[in-house]
Amino acid sequence: MSAISDRIFVQEHLAREHEASELSPEEAERLKAEIKELLVQEDAVLVAHYYTDPLLQALAEETGGCVADSLEMARFGNQHPASTLMVCGVRFMGETAKILNPEKTVLMPTLEATCSLDIGCPVEEFSAFCDEHSDRTVVVYANTSAAVKARADWVVTSSIALDIVEYLHERGEKIIWAPDKHLGGYVKNKTGADVLLWDGSCIVHEEFKSKGLSDLKQLYPDAAVLVHPESPEAVVEMADVVGSTSQLINAVKSMSNEQFIVATDAGIFYKMQQMAPEKTLIEAPTAGNGATCRSCAHCPWMAMNGLENLRDVLISKRQEIIVEADLREKALIPLQRMLNFSKERQMAVKGNA
């Protein structure tokens, strides 16, 4: 096992030990009432990622916040008048919010909630890798630390990655892609670009297997298969729709199918069911069941976000995201490059994990 794999394994284990505890309905209602009062008192708005606990997603909507992907969460915070953003998600999402909203206080229920893609792309090793291939344009996925973004030429989300890499390919540029090898491989195959892949992956999406998906499809032959491109190639090849979180949600709403097999984090079901309550959603099978599966289609770091630590941080202000000014300025350059690219082509930039 490599040093990076060791780090991911240890962090994953720690995350499972600190997952938010289950609450009784009475406890949940009490905490929600406290949080609603604190949000007003602290001039704060709650933004939650699609993969967080449905209780948090519902609370964000009830209190005038939003449920979205990480970039849309940050942009919502930029447009909202609140002076404090409470970000329910994982750390790189809080950093992205801070990069785009430097004048605001950005809090998270816990700063320990990270991501296997982030852990799997440490800036020192990644920078050395880039230096070894200095003739290549560096493209990084939004699911990375501020430090890795600062080393990049472009930041991309899964919904715009194909367009940007195709643009670079047409310009004759060779590319370094990081960190997700599956998404990178998908983009490479679709565009034909010369792409050198960093060896990273999402522990949730890597668990989906084509054999289990094929077996499930036999049980539900009329179901459309929706797959996030962070999944292995064999799973992606079985998809009726390959897309970002937002694109998969829109597919459930717009497609005529009554049943959908969904290969992404199960937290997304809250929004899918809200948008299309008449549709039947089926979890795509992971590599195992119960104690034998690694993620069981739910990110252990997302599960660290809960009502209790959310309430506690609104009181203590201790879990604040800090991005140093010089790092923020460097990380903003490739991020802004993506936003400008999107604006020039009048595209909607949504859909990192």
UniProtKB/Swiss-Prot annotation:
It is found in: Cytoplasm. Catalyzes the condensation of iminoaspartate with dihydroxyacetone phosphate to form quinolinate. It comes from Hahella chejuensis (strain KCTC 2396). Iminosuccinate binds at H49, S70, Y141, A142, N143, S158, H228, P229, E230, T245. The keyword S-adenosyl-L-methionine does not apply. It holds the Pfam family NadA. NCBIfam families: nadA (TIGR00550), PRK09375.1-1 (NF006877), PRK09375.1-2 (NF006878). It catalyses: iminosuccinate + dihydroxyacetone phosphate = quinolinate + phosphate + 2 H2O + H(+). Binds 1 [4Fe-4S] cluster per subunit. Its EC number is 2.5.1.72. It is an enzyme of class 2 (transferase). Keywords: 4Fe-4S, Cytoplasm, Iron, Iron-sulfur, Metal-binding, Pyridine nucleotide biosynthesis, Transferase. This is Quinolinate synthase. GO terms for cellular component: cytosol.
